[in-house]
Structures are given as structure tokens and as C-alpha cells.
């Protein structure tokens, strides 16, 4: 029997601190209730264990589990079936998490890449996971890359799905449109939660801004129309007002998508590399990974592989079997090929250093 455990944070104690000037000014301008400030949050998660284990009963803390990190406006629920398959195919536990301001996790500031990396490290430490493998998609992919570069001792390997380690001003319009369309749905279309046609009306409202039906379906998966099923009650969302709401504090997230989502801390990461194996899955009809991205990928991740799949950026929804096969093949085969190449390169360096030392001693 396949096992899955769901855990939600409860009884959070909020750290009361002054907001950053940017966040405070933005919230005041929009007349928003303030989000609490927390350096780290305990992310909600699902734990998926293999359906059939070749080693009998799988221990809870198996070596090198996988943490699956979703994208902007995603959640662990979107990929629970995929992660169940991964757990069985790879015979390892797979944790799917909700990042802050998503799914069942706490709504809090700051909401930036460094904070999301801190949440990830906090999660691994809290659950005593040791070294782990990462699978990240879109926003989650950028967090995974940053985590590997800033904390290489904590991560063994990573699978990066359609994102690259660089500044990406060209992706900002798409991601801004996603969040802005959600805000417009709430602010300009009074769809009641008890309306039997709420899903159709919400989809039609989003259609004005998001013509792609698949993307609208992705966004609609975040809507709450029944306050009794809310797993986390946000301090800035009134679930009992009879209207539709998103699981995300989308109004508060606009500052992130306009200023942070396309960023990359080039200066902070100068000279840093992650020497573990990394697999990039590129969607061929997406520009999140483009020819110019290869230089940055080579710079930060010298032991990498790139798989290509015919899809748009929403590759997980469009090509689930193909991307799962690519992830599985990487962790089963390609990662070990890359590790072997790394060991060969290190052996050559050691040999050269030994030769230089011997030559110096003779001189």
C-alpha cells in the first residue's frame, strides 16, 4: 500500500517586527492588512513513501529523500500523484511542500528568494533529513538552484524543471499576468462562493487576462469556495464573507512578482559552484531556458545534463509522463554518470597537483 502523510503547521507564534520599507509602503498604498513577519515558516507537506519497497519496510528517515518544490501559485496538491509515482519508481521518500503564501502553509513576509531558501533549509533540519535531493519547478527551480549554491553541503543532487540561474526580465510579464489576473478576479468580478456556476464564472473572468484554458485550470485549483475546508486561515483573508478567495494572499504577492521573481543574486554568488549532479529539463516552447542560459548553467553547475521536452513552461501539466521519465532517469542513471565524471576530473587535478609538488621539490 502506498503511504502518504499530510502535515499542516498549527499554532504558529508570529514574530512581531517592523516591515521593510518597501513592503510597508506597498501594503499601505493598497490598503491591505499587514502580513506577519517571519524569518522562517514550518512548511506544510505531504510525505509519499514507495508502494513496494525492495528493502522491506521503508524507514521514515531514509537516506537522500527528495523534496519537491512547486512553482508560483502552485501547491503540493497539484503534484501529489506525480510524487507518489516518483517515490515508488525511485524507492525513496518524496516530500512535497507548500512554500510560504501557498497551499496550506503560513502567509508571511518576507517573500523573496533568500527567505524561501531559508525555509527549505529549515524544513530539512527540522525533519532531520540529512543530505537530500531536490526537484524544483519554475519558482521552485530557482529556489532549488540557490539552495544548492548557498548550502552545497546539504544537497546531493537536483533536478531543475524549466528555469535557469540568471536574471530573466523576459519572464516577468507572464508571471505578473498570473498574479494580476487573480487580483482582478477578486477586485472586479463579484463571484459568490455559493454560486453553482462559480467555477465557470471565475474561468470566464480569468479568460479576459489568461486565454489559455490549461493555465486557467491551474489558477482555479487555488480557489476556495467553502470556508469549512480551509486548512490554513490567513490573517489577511476573510473566508466567511461569502465570496471566492484564493489560497494565496495574491494582493500581497504583487510586490514579489514585479520586483523579485525575475531576479538573480549574481554578485552574491560570484565564484560559487555546486559540484553535485544537476539535471535541467527544458521546455522547448518556453524561454525560461534559452541559448544564453547555457553560459550561466555551465558557470554554476559544471556537472549537469539538459533534457528537452516539447512543451510550454507549464510542462508538468502538459507532459506529465515525459517529465517524470526524465526525473526518474536522472536519479537512476544520469546522476551517477555525472558523479563519475566529477571524480575523474578531481583525480586528474590531484595528479597534476602531485606532479607540480614533485617538480617543485626537485627544483
Curated annotation (Swiss-Prot):
Task of the protein: Alcohol acetyltransferase that catalyzes the synthesis of ethyl acetate from ethanol and acetyl-CoA. Can also function as a thioesterase by hydrolyzing acetyl-CoA in the absence of ethanol, as well as esterase hydrolyzing ethyl acetate.
Coiled-coil ranges from the UniProt annotation: none
Catalytic activity: ethanol + acetyl-CoA = ethyl acetate + CoA; acetyl-CoA + H2O = acetate + CoA + H(+); ethyl acetate + H2O = ethanol + acetate + H(+)
Molecular functions (GO terms): acetyl-CoA hydrolase activity; carboxylic ester hydrolase activity; transferase activity
UniProt domain AB hydrolase-1: residue ranges: 65-164
UniProt-listed InterPro entries: AB_hydrolase_1, AB_hydrolase_fold
One Pfam family of this chain: Abhydrolase_1
Protein family (similarity comment): Belongs to the AB hydrolase superfamily.
Membrane-spanning intervals of the chain: none
Keyword terms: Hydrolase, Mitochondrion, Transferase, Transit peptide
E.C. number: 2.3.1.268, 3.1.2.1, 3.1.1.-
Domain of life from the UniProt record: Eukaryota
Transit sequence range: 1-19
Protein name stated in the entry: Ethanol acetyltransferase 1
Active-site residues per Swiss-Prot or TrEMBL entry: 138, 162, 313
Cellular component terms per the entry's GO annotation: mitochondrion
Places the protein is found: Mitochondrion
Keyword Phosphoprotein: no
Name of the coding gene: EAT1
Amino acid at each position: 500500500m502506498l503511504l502518504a502523510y499530510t502535515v499542516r503547521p498549527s499554532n504558529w507564534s508570529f514574530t512581531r517586527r517592523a516591515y521593510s520599507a518597501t513592503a510597508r509602503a506597498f501594503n499601505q498604498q493598497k490598503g491591505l492588512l499587514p502580513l506577519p513577519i517571519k524569518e522562517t515558516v514550518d512548511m506544510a507537506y505531504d510525505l509519499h513513501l514507495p508502494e513496494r519497497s525492495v528493502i522491506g519496510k521503508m524507514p521514515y528517515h531514509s537516506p537522500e529523500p527528495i523534496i519537491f518544490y512547486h512553482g508560483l501559485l502552485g501547491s503540493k496538491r497539484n503534484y501529489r500523484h506525480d510524487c507518489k509515482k516518483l517515490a515508488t519508481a525511485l524507492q525513496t521518500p518524496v516530500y512535497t511542500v507548500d512554500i510560504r503564501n501557498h497551499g496550506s502553509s503560513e502567509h508571511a513576509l518576507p517573500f523573496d528568494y533568500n527567505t524561501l531558501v531559508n525555509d527549505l533549509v529549515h524544513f530539512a533540519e527540522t525533519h532531520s533529513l540529512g543530505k537530500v535531493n531536490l526537484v524544483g519547478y519554475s519558482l521552485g527551480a530557482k529556489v532549488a538552484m540557490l539552495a544548492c549554491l548557498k548550502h552545497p553541503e546539504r544537497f546531493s543532487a537536483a533536478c531543475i524543471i524549466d528555469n535557469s540561474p540568471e536574471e530573466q526580465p523576459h519572464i516577468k510579464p507572464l508571471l505578473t499576468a498570473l498574479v494580476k489576473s487573480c487580483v482582478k478576479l477578486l477586485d472586479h468580478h463579484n463571484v459568490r462562493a455559493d454560486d453553482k456556476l462559480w467555477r465557470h464564472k471565475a474561468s470566464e473572468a480569468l479568460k479576459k487576462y489568461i486565454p489559455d484554458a490549461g493555465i486557467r485550470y491551474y489558477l482555479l485549483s487555488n480557489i476556495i469556495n467553502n470556508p469549512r475546508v480551509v486548512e490554513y486561515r490567513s490573517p489577511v483573508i476573510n473566508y466567511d464573507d461569502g465570496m471566492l478567495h484564493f489560497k494565496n494572499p495574491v494582493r500581497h504577492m504583487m510586490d514579489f512578482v514585479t520586483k523579485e521573481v525575475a531576479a538573480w543574486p549574481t554578485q552574491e554568488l560570484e565564484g560559487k559552484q555546486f559540484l553535485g549532479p544537476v539535471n535541467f529539463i527544458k521546455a522547448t516552447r518556453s524561454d525560461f531556458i534559452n541559448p544564453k542560459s547555457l553560459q550561466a548553467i555551465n558557470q554554476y553547475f559544471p556537472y549537469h545534463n539538459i533534457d528537452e521536452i516539447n512543451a510550454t513552461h507549464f510542462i508538468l501539466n502538459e507532459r506529465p509522463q515525459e517529465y517524470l521519465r526524465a526525473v526518474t532517469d536522472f536519479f537512476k542513471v544520469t546522476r551517477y554518470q555525472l558523479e563519475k565524471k566529477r571524480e575523474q576530473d578531481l583525480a586528474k587535478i590531484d595528479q597534476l597537483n602531485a606532479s607540480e609538488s614533485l617538480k617543485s621539490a626537485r627544483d
